[in-house]
Regions:
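Bacterial N-terminal signal peptides that target proteins for export
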Residues: 1-8
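Compositionally biased, low-complexity segments enriched in small residues
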Residues: 1, 14-15, 259, 263
Length: 279
C-alpha cells in the first residue's frame, strides 16, 4: 500500500515538474508556400557525402506541409527601462558539427553562459564566427572533439557562424541578456522554461529568412500561450542566396585551411561544394 501511495505521489510530482517547466509556450507557423530548399551537393567531399545516404537540403527554412516552422527564436522583448531578472543557465549552450552540418542551426545563449563547440566528425572543420559586438573566433577542429570551451558572450548580438572548409555549413547565434528565450522545433512548437513574472509582455519571433514578428502576451500564474505566424512573402531572399559567395580563407589557427579561395554556387538546383564548380 505504501508503495502505491509513493508511486502516485511520484507521478503527481513529475506532472507538476513538467508543468512548471513550461512557462510560455506556443507555435510558429508559415502562411504561404515555403521557399524550395536546394540540395547540397557534397559529392566532391567524400567524408561528408558518405554520411548521407539521402540528399541533404539547405536548412535555412525548415517547414512542414502544414506550415509548422522550425528554427524560430522566440524571446521577450526588453522594453526601455524594463528589468528582466533571471539566472544564467547552468548548462552550456552547445554547437555541434555532424555530417558536415551544424546542429543546432540556430544557437541561443545568454550573456555569461558557458559555450561549447563540438565536432562529431573525425575530420577537419573550421569554426568561424562573424561576430562584431562580441569578440570573433576562428579556429580549426581537425579531429573528433567532445567539447572546446570558448569565452562566454558579453553583448547582445545576432551573428553567423560558418565553416571555411565546407562552405555550405552555416549557423546563426543569438545572444540575449536575459534567459527568456526558446527555439521552435520541427513541429513549430517552442517552450520558454525560465520563470517569467506575471504581467504584460511583448514577445518577438525571429527567423533568419522571414524577419521578426511581435505579439503581445499576458503571463498569468506563470503561464502564457503566444503563437506566431510568418508570411512566406516576407522571405528576404532565396534560402541559398547567402551561400553563393562564401570565401574560404586561411587562418593562423587552422593551417590546414590554407587553400585557394573557393565559393559555393548553384547549378542544376543544387548548392555545390568547393570543388564541384569545375565539373
Amino acid at each position: 500500500m505504501k508503495m502505491k501511495i509513493w508511486m502516485a505521489a511520484l507521478a503527481v510530482s513529475a506532472g507538476l515538474c513538467t508543468s512548471a517547466m513550461a512557462q510560455v509556450t506556443g507555435k510558429a507557423t508559415l502562411d504561404g508556400k515555403a521557399p524550395e530548399m536546394k540540395e547540397i551537393d557534397m559529392s566532391t567531399v567524400k567524408e561528408c557525402n558518405d554520411q548521407h545516404p539521402d540528399p541533404v537540403k539547405d536548412d535555412s527554412v525548415v517547414a512542414s506541409e502544414k506550415g509548422e516552422l522550425a528554427n524560430v527564436v522566440v524571446s521577450v522583448k526588453k522594453e526601455e527601462g524594463m528589468d528582466l531578472p533571471g539566472d544564467v543557465p547552468k548548462t552550456a549552450a552547445e554547437l555541434d558539427q555532424h555530417g558536415c552540418m551544424y546542429s543546432p542551426h540556430v544557437l541561443t545563449a545568454m550573456i555569461g553562459q558557458e559555450i561549447v563547440i563540438k565536432n562529431q566528425d573525425t575530420f577537419l572543420h573550421n569554426v568561424h564566427a562573424l561576430s562584431s559586438a562580441n569578440p570573433p573566433f576562428n579556429f580549426g577542429q581537425p579531429t573528433k572533439d567532445d567539447g572546446k570551451k570558448i569565452d562566454p558572450f558579453k553583448t547582445v548580438e545576432t551573428f553567423k557562424v560558418k565553416c571555411d572548409v565546407h562552405p555550405w555549413m552555416l549557423a546563426y547565434v543569438r545572444v540575449f541578456d536575459h534567459p527568456f528565450f526558446a527555439t521552435s522545433k520541427e513541429d513549430g512548437t517552442y517552450s520558454i522554461t525560465a520563470k517569467l513574472p506575471d504581467g504584460e509582455y511583448t514577445f518577438v519571433g525571429w527567423h533568419e529568412k522571414f524577419g521578426e514578428v511581435e505579439q503581445k502576451g499576458t503571463v498569468k500564474d506563470g503561464k502564457a500561450e503566444v503563437n506566431f505566424v510568418f508570411k512566406s512573402s516576407d522571405a528576404a531572399a532565396p534560402a541559398s542566396k547567402e551561400m553563393k559567395e562564401v570565401a574560404v580563407k586561411s587562418d593562423a589557427s587552422c593551417p590546414s585551411c590554407d587553400k585557394p579561395e573557393a565559393k559555393v554556387v548553384e547549378k542544376d538546383d543544387k548548392v555545390l561544394g568547393p570543388q564541384a564548380m569545375a565539373r
